Amino acid sequence: LPIYYDEIALDYCSAGCWSEAAGLWNVAITEGSVTPMTYYYLGWCLTQGKLSGAEQALADAAQACSDYCFPNRLEAILALQCAMEQNPNDAKAPYYLGNLYYDKRQYDLALEAWETSAKLDDKFPTIWRNLALANFNKKNEEARAIEYMERAFRLDKTDARVLMELDQLYKRVRRSHAERLAFLQQYPELIAQRDDLVLEEITLLNQTGEYEKAKTLLDAHIFHPWEGGEGKVPGQYQFARVELAKKALEAGNYSQAIPLLEECLEYPHHLGEGKLYGAQENDFYYFMGCAYEGLGQSDKAAECWEQAIVGPTEPAAAMYYNDAKPDKIFYQGLALLKLGRMDEANGRFHKLTS
């Protein structure tokens, strides 16, 4: 691995053994075990040791593929600064240096380095993406961040991650659901590459009242677990079905509402996660009871409403996806009203307003 060559060669550099270090990096190049930093380190080493070949090494560094290159060592700062001095037209050296500074929370230095890189090469999408995130997160420059992220996406409309990040910026600046949905749906091939983009489209469909489309899209996609996504897919799965069930109840199609609500109680495999112990299902059972009531099946309706009053009764902040949600208490109250237990129902409602 390139890192092993770097470790030993940098030890040689620390001892002032520039020729030996350069020899080791040349072995790495011969073996094909390289990253762009291999060439930057070699160029810096040759410069420090006043050896020949530094100019060629730094030229090779500037042309090397930048994919997955994330310098993180303190020595990398010296090597990249050397490259910026010796080869001032190299746009990648300040880009890598900005990445390193940002990782070390030196945000002003990172922005300065990235801006230098952008001036040297304004056709590199990632530099605009990085500048967008830094301006939004560290400078609160919303308009500039969006301008830069849009530029990054225009430069490479095959990058699904940048599409996702651009949409997230639109969400943060409160673009309308309809506008965001129309934008995303221009790129179905990119959406299909990422579960989070598929979920975002489904969420926007639900938020714009397109429940049937949301349900169809969600049911056709196989999701995979990802950190930070816990509970989001089942949430939209259930939301679409509850809203469709409510529409069926309003139209008097009670038998149509029941299977939709029953589906909310089961998590099919394609959601990518299972139902947690103690999941609150008050609203599902409340509406199911209403459907059975509409069909004249009062016993089944009462059974559903009894299920709907089960669960925590004290409102609390829902900080995590698996925390008890206070709005479920509202449906407990509605179910208690249906059961004729007025005092208990008012007690639930009072807790939500006191």
Locate the predicted segments by residue.
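Flexible helix-coil transition and linker loops at the boundaries of alpha-helical arrays
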Residues: 67-69, 81-86, 186-190, 224-234, ...
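Position-specific recognition of the canonical hydrophobic site in helix A of tetratricopeptide repeat
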Residues: 13, 47, 102, 136-137, ...
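Residue-level recognition of tetratricopeptide repeat
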Residues: 10, 44, 99, 133-134, ...
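Single-residue signature of alpha-solenoid repeat helices
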Residues: 21, 54, 76, 110, ...
